[in-house]
């Protein structure tokens, strides 16, 4: 069983790495144009937070080194993304991004780690507390896929929900959910089970609306849809994250 979970975890690592790298095209555009334009930094800041907490969880939880390796990679990549955003963002946005990043990726992780280590002497309880926090954050971050699905139903168009991103959300959730079952890890199982369900729902919606006649978009809805298109790569980041 341990050997099976190892191979499943390796597959999960490969898929998660591909998902972490999926925003490269977006940031290549930012670098090329030397402007962040209308792109948002929050998805990458939140993904960095999730990756950092899961890295710590993998380090302090026996047998979960595959979780720490992929999320350590993810934290590094997301740090690069956020740094590029800060470099090319206008001054007013830079200051706002620094404030949010410091709050979520400096103060919050430190507070979470210090609080769990102060509250519990048992290492198992400490790791479980971090796992609970990480799983909760992942589930909250799934609000973005829900927004993408709402846009598809409203517009009857899958333009803003690319097939491959939905497919990898489905596949990533499935692989890590299986890994969690083999490892008997409920903190990995719950968020990745949710990711699998949302990925399945998105693939079903894609099948229903891929040939449907799109409905005209209002300006407000167009902006929402555009945001989804620009931020879709990070909407899957609750990946196991």
From Swiss-Prot:
Disruption phenotype: High fructose levels in leaves, especially in vacuoles, due to impaired vacuolar fructose export. Increased root sensitivity to high levels of fructose. Its main location: membrane. Keywords: Membrane, Repeat, Sugar transport, Transmembrane, Transmembrane helix, Transport, Vacuole. It comes from the Eukaryota. The keyword Membrane applies. Residues 1-3, 63-69, 116-128, 183-185 are vacuolar. Induction: Slightly induced by the fungal pathogen B.cinerea. Accumulates in response to nitrogen deficiency and cold stress. Expression follows a diurnal rhythm with a peak in the middle of the day. Induced in roots by fructose (Fru) and darkness, thus triggering accumulation and release of vacuolar Fru, respectively. Residues 25-41, 91-94, 150-161, 207-241 are cytoplasmic. Pfam families: MtN3_slv (PF03083). GO terms for cellular component: membrane; plant-type vacuole membrane. One of its GO terms (molecular function) is fructose transmembrane transporter activity. It is found in: Vacuole membrane. It is a multi-pass membrane protein. The chain crosses the membrane at residues 4-24, 42-62, 70-90, 95-115, 129-149, 162-182, 186-206. Belongs to the SWEET sugar transporter family. Acts as a vacuolar hexose transporter. Regulates fructose (Fru) homeostasis in leaves and roots by exporting/importing Fru through the tonoplast regarding metabolic demand. Forms homooligomers and heterooligomers with SWEET1, SWEET2, SWEET3, SWEET4, SWEET6, SWEET7, SWEET8, SWEET9, SWEET11, SWEET12, SWEET13, SWEET15 and SWEET16. This is Bidirectional sugar transporter SWEET17. It comes from Arabidopsis thaliana (Mouse-ear cress).
